[in-house]
Amino acid sequence: MAEDTETRPASAGAEEREEGEIADDGDGSSAAAAGRITAHPLENAWTFWFDNPQGKSRQVAWGSTIHPIHTFSTVEDFWGLYNNIHNPSKLNVGADFHCFKNKIEPKWEDPICANGGKWTISCGRGKSDTFWLHTLLAMIGEQFDFGDEICGAVVSVRQKQERVAIWTKNAANEAAQISIGKQWKEFLDYKDSIGFIVHEDAKRSDKGPKNRYTV
């Protein structure tokens, strides 16, 4: 998908935008220009979410700081969004970007996510940008054999590392989870082992849940 569409450069004001903020020229010119371009629709619509709990009280309920940024359903709209927000490596420690199929919230409590789990890749600080982009392209481009099992992806910036994760619907479907994990590693050319954690196991464990699957 990415090879068929030319990326657009970020706007000149990108460095001055706050995290999660989308550039807007205010005169409607971007929307007008988009209307003159033949759009390439995606199989699914996707919503970008941003979570920046920095400065919030630790008593605030988990998930209460997550808010949607933009929903896109074409290749052009994706690049228009991606080129006008910060890369993960530029986010504050503790912040997360989420990209989930439209109408699925990036929360364990969402009924579509409730019985699922996640594959996770960890990397050093400042190293997640490429992993995140390639994950998004594979996901919204429907490159996974079990793409219907995928809810979305998350990139998390933490003090000592950054993490990219793919959330799936049905943790009990071992064949689907193994396929997704293996294909994801291939798309990213990632050589180390990765583990799949079931959401229910994560909620019950205080010391860190064990991997249900490993590839």
UniProtKB/Swiss-Prot annotation:
| Post-translation changes | According to the redox status, the Cys-113-Cys-151 disulfide bridge may have a role in regulating protein function by affecting its ability to bind capped mRNA.
Annotated disulfide bonds: C113-C151
Could you give a GO molecular-function term held by this entry? RNA binding
**Do the record's keywords include Cell division?**
no
Task: Cite the residue spans of the region called EIF4G-binding.
Answer: 40-43, 50-86, 134-143
Biased composition regions of type Acidic residues, renumbered to the chain: 16-27
Identify the residues that bind mRNA.
Answer: 58-63, 90, 108-109, 158-163, 203-207
Which UniProt keywords are given for this protein, alphabetically ordered?
Answer: Cytoplasm, Disulfide bond, Initiation factor, Nucleus, Protein biosynthesis, RNA-binding, Translation regulation
| GO cellular component term, pick one | nucleus
Q: What are the recorded Gene Ontology BP terms?
A: defense response to virus; regulation of translation; translational initiation
Location in the cell: Nucleus; Cytoplasm
InterPro entries the record matches: TIF_eIF4e-like, TIF_eIF_4E, TIF_eIF_4E_CS
Q: Which residues cross the membrane?
A: none
Entry-linked Pfam families: IF4E (PF01652)
Q: Note down the stretches annotated as region Disordered.
A: 1-32
Record's subunit section: EIF4F is a multi-subunit complex, the composition of which varies with external and internal environmental conditions. It is composed of at least EIF4A, EIF4E and EIF4G. EIF4E is also known to interact with other partners. In higher plants two isoforms of EIF4F have been identified, named isoform EIF4F and isoform EIF(iso)4F. Isoform EIF4F has subunits p220 and p26, whereas isoform EIF(iso)4F has subunits p82 and p28.
Q: What does this protein do?
A: Component of the protein complex eIF4F, which is involved in the recognition of the mRNA cap, ATP-dependent unwinding of 5'-terminal secondary structure and recruitment of mRNA to the ribosome. Recognizes and binds the 7-methylguanosine-containing mRNA cap during an early step in the initiation of protein synthesis and facilitates ribosome binding by inducing the unwinding of the mRNAs secondary structures.
Name the PANTHER family on file.
EUKARYOTIC TRANSLATION INITIATION FACTOR 4E RELATED (PTHR11960), EUKARYOTIC TRANSLATION INITIATION FACTOR 4E1-RELATED (PTHR11960:SF8)
- Into which family does the record put it? Belongs to the eukaryotic initiation factor 4E family.
Indicate what this protein is called per its UniProt record.
Eukaryotic translation initiation factor 4E-1
Which organism is the protein's source? Triticum aestivum
